[in-house]
Amino acid sequence: MANASQCLDDVPMGGRWPAAPPDQYNEAHRLAMEELVSGGPEAMRGFLKRERLPSFLSEPEMGEILGCASVLPCGDEENSMSASVDCSSVTYFPDRSDVEPPILELGWPAFTTGSYRGVTRVDVHFQPSFGDTIYTCKEAARELIRSAREVIALVMDNFTDNDIFRDIHEACRKRRVPVYILLDQTQVSHFLTMCYNLGVSIETEPHMRVRLLTGNHYYTRSGTKIIGKVREKFLLVDGVKVATGNYSFTWTDGKLNSSNMLVLSGQVVEKFDLQFRILYAQSNPIGAKLLSSIRSRAMCLDKLPCKLPASKKPTLSSLLRMDQAKLSSTPKRHFDEFGAKFNRDVVALDKAAEDEWLQSCDIISGLKEMQTVEVQTEPWEGKNNVRGVDVGIQTSVAAANAATQTSVLSRMASTQTVMVSRSITTQTTETSQCTTQTPAPTSSVARLSNSSNSSSSSFSSTSITSTGSNCSMKSSDFSGTAFYQPEYPLGNCFKKLTKDRQYHYSTIRSKLNHMVSILSNRNRMPNSYMANDAPCYGLQRREIMHGSLLNLRDGVRFYPNM
């Protein structure tokens, strides 16, 4: 009979112990991590280049690892060894233990290991959804919480959703359902801030337990510890249903981000039951120092004075500035650049309104004063009057017209239309103020009829043509830059609107008069035909034609000689 040593010799090499899975440990990656922690990303890239290895970490991962790395204090291991009562740190644990995790202190559903929990069913939810409910993941989680009767167990990386927390707090306070919450250590401060804002103190809740959870720990030879994060997300309700997926209990995941959730029931829930108890045994309670710091910071934020901008009533100047910005060709320019110029425009607008009122008084009384150019047309009954007015133009010998601005003021009345043209000429002289007065040919012609309110006058580059009782401004050239303003004054805008309105009214009135005259002629036509008189048509005399120039534009009217 062969002995034990001979039996061992017959066994092939490596057959007694299982082979390690491939790629479970990589010495090159460990050395690269040492370089990253000690020298930063550049040192790690240099090491990978020397070893001719591809990079296995992205830029966000490098930043996350450096943010989680912390140097261990001296004597930390000795203190932890002496503080351990059961010497669990030096106790050997086999791969599979027959000892169950500890029972949770608030109670747990009475399911033994391997007990039947029903047929496994899966409900899949995607968010955003295109069905009846858009936010299906959030609604599914809230429905599970409302249906809880025995226990609510939650493992989450980030928990800041107010609606879901209110549902959990209501189940804890009103229905007395035990609640266990395990959160990532780096995100628990945000959860505590949310609780304080909602007026909930978790340390005084008798049916709620909140604990901290971390990922795996990685130690380097230089004494640096890298702590991983929690990425597990599942909600266990009554030990029979569980919701899991990439959906986090935050407002952004509930409204903005796309996510999915699986609602599982049946025998598969046993795996999540065991996993939660393992994680709860590995978790740590929240320290009193962290609670006090969160509370003090929230109180400081509440005491800060909230200075709201005083609401100001819109004034006339602010409204005018807004209109000035709208009319400007470059509205994005700062208003201060046009502040002084805008104030001058407002004063000039008031002065112009006063001058216009005085001019209207002069028109009524029949008096008219012209400063530079005088063109006045008066309608006379039964005849046309054409009047030419010499226009004086002042020019300098040394320099010609430097800047010229022409403004036209128009007044429309029932019997008279007055055109006022003002020309402002600036001149530059080198040695002497030598000027000459040169008469210019007739530049304004007024055409009148027996009952019309039209006038036509033109001066320089301003041409005004009036047909019927309407006036239309053709063109107004502003040469030079001395009087050029980039903003259109508000007063001119209202003047233009009034002129356009009067133009439309006069057009309608002239058309109505034309239609009345046509209808009156039609009434005379049957009488002529009934009398069997051959009508003789001839040109209407110019003296008794209708006063509206619109009839001349439409065509010459004929009528039977009576």
UniProtKB/Swiss-Prot annotation:
Keywords: Cell cycle, Cell division, Cytoplasm, Cytoskeleton, Mitosis. InterPro entries: FAM83 (IPR050944), SACK1 (IPR012461). The keyword ATP-binding does not apply. Residues 424-471 are annotated as: Disordered. GO terms for biological process: cell division; cell population proliferation; metaphase chromosome alignment; positive regulation of cell cycle G1/S phase transition; protein localization to mitotic spindle; regulation of ERK1 and ERK2 cascade; regulation of TOR signaling; signal transduction. The keyword Transmembrane helix does not apply. Its main location: cytoplasm. GO terms for cellular component: cytoplasm; cytosol; mitotic spindle pole. It is found in: Cytoplasm; Cytoplasm, Cytoskeleton, Spindle; Cytoplasm, Cytoskeleton, Spindle pole. GO terms for molecular function: protein kinase binding. SUPFAM superfamilies: Phospholipase D/nuclease. Residues 425-471 have a biased composition (Low complexity). PANTHER family: PROTEIN FAM83A-RELATED. Belongs to the FAM83 family. May regulate cell proliferation, growth, migration and epithelial to mesenchymal transition. May also be important for proper chromosome congression and alignment during mitosis. This is Protein FAM83D-A.
